[in-house]
């Protein structure tokens, strides 16, 4: 019986193959269509007990586009290549984070997590 190699899994979409930039943009478009406010966070070693990640700049309050968010993901990826990077979505009605997914893992191909 063939088994998959052991690998840490994090949050939504982590059991799927790595996302391309185009797939990340589609997920961000979904966040925007739902009225969520996107943001980018990074963490060097995300252990289960680590509840707070470092925010990359500020969340995109106002009229953000998927391309603007993707540009920030790329910039965060180039500044922090040894960190896990995720996109998050805030719901300003419920006043909480509603969505998050990993877009970059260290030691992976560029353009994919």
UniProtKB/Swiss-Prot annotation:
SMART domains in alphabetical order: RuBisCO_small (SM00961)
One annotated GO biological process: reductive pentose-phosphate cycle
Keywords noted in UniProt: Bacterial microcompartment, Calvin cycle, Carbon dioxide fixation, Carboxysome, Photorespiration, Photosynthesis
Gene3D superfamilies: Ribulose bisphosphate carboxylase, small subunit (3.30.190.10)
Keyword Hydrolase: no
Gene Ontology CC entries for this record: carboxysome
Keyword field contains Lipid metabolism: no
Location within or outside the cell: Carboxysome
Annotated InterPro entries: RuBisCO_ssu (IPR024681), RuBisCO_ssu_dom (IPR000894), RuBisCO_ssu_sf (IPR036385)
Assembly and binders: Heterohexadecamer of 8 large and 8 small subunits. RuBisCO interacts with the C-terminus of CcmM, and can be found in complexes that also include carbonic anhydrase (ccaA).
Recorded family membership: Belongs to the RuBisCO small chain family.
Protein name per Swiss-Prot or TrEMBL: Ribulose bisphosphate carboxylase small subunit
Organism: Synechocystis sp. (strain ATCC 27184 / PCC 6803 / Kazusa)
């Amino acid at each position: 019986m063939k088994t998959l190699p052991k690998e840490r899994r994090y949050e939504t979409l982590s059991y799927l193959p790595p996302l391309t930039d185009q797939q990340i943009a589609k997920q961000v478009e979904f966040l925007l269509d739902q009225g969520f406010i996107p943001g980018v966070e990074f963490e060097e070693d995300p252990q289960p007990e680590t509840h707070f990640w470092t925010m990359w700049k500020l969340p995109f309050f106002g009229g953000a586009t998927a391309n603007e968010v993707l540009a920030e993901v790329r910039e965060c990826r180039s500044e922090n290549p040894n960190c896990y990077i995720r996109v998050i979505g805030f719901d300003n009605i419920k006043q909480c984070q509603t969505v998050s997914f990993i877009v970059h893992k260290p030691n992976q191909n560029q353009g994919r997590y």
